[in-house]
């Protein structure tokens, strides 16, 4: 009942598990603070990076929930289903709605990534490609093969902080 009283944006925020996007926001803040420290911060690019990374993380959360649901991992007994809303598992949204959210959220993230590639240059391409790889393949097969935690370490560390630093500052730094 409460679900249907929410507008589309409220339902989307719940579906993407917006409460955990703080992890991504924190990595982006770190990249921005490092660029600010080195007096190379471009605020406009930082805002784009932050929005793009949060949308990519949101896309991954949607893919994660959809994949786990369709593979039978998520059901009423699944731990996360007991403390948080799983719209697909609880029948609050259809598979088509989930695919639509994945597509639209993913296209928005990719659009920002392509804009940053155009604005900052070709070094953004491998960062964008790595980000796409982890968004698409974190849930399966990486997590299934026991590589989920190392992937998280790579994504929220060097990729988001180091890559974010490059995009907002225009400089590559191995120290960062």
Residues of each region from the PLM?
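Topogenic membrane-insertion module of multi-pass membrane proteins
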Residues: 1-44, 48, 145
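Internal alpha-helical transmembrane segments of multi-pass membrane proteins, especially GPCRs
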Residues: 14-18, 47, 51, 100-103, ...
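Alpha-helical transmembrane segments of multipass membrane proteins
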Residues: 27, 52, 56, 60, ...
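Early transmembrane hairpin module of multi-pass membrane proteins
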Residues: 56, 60-70, 96-104
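Membrane-embedded alpha-helical segments that form the functional core of polytopic membrane enzymes
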Residues: 30, 39-66, 125-136, 173-176
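Intramembrane alpha-helical segments
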Residues: 85-172
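Cytosolic, membrane-interface loops and tails of multi-pass inner-membrane proteins
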Residues: 1-9, 67-93
């Amino acid at each position: 009942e409460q679900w249907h009283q929410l507008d589309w944006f409220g339902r989307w925020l719940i579906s993407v598990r917006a409460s955990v996007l703080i992890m991504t926001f924190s990595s982006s803040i770190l990249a921005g603070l490092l660029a600010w420290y080195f007096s190379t911060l471009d605020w406009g690019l930082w805002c784009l990076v932050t929005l793009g990374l949060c949308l990519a993380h949101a896309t991954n959360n949607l893919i994660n929930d959809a994949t786990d649901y369709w593979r039978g991992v998520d059901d009423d007994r699944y731990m996360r289903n007991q403390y948080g809303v799983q719209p697909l598992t609880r029948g609050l949204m259809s598979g088509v709605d989930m695919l639509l959210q994945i597509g639209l959220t993913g296209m928005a993230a990719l659009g920002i990534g392509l804009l940053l590639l155009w604005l900052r240059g070709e070094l953004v391409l491998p960062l964008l490609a790595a980000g796409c790889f982890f968004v698409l393949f974190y849930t399966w097969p990486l997590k299934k093969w026991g590589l989920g935690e190392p992937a998280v370490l790579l994504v929220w560390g060097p990729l988001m902080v180091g890559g974010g630093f490059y995009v907002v500052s225009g400089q590559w730094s191995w120290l960062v």
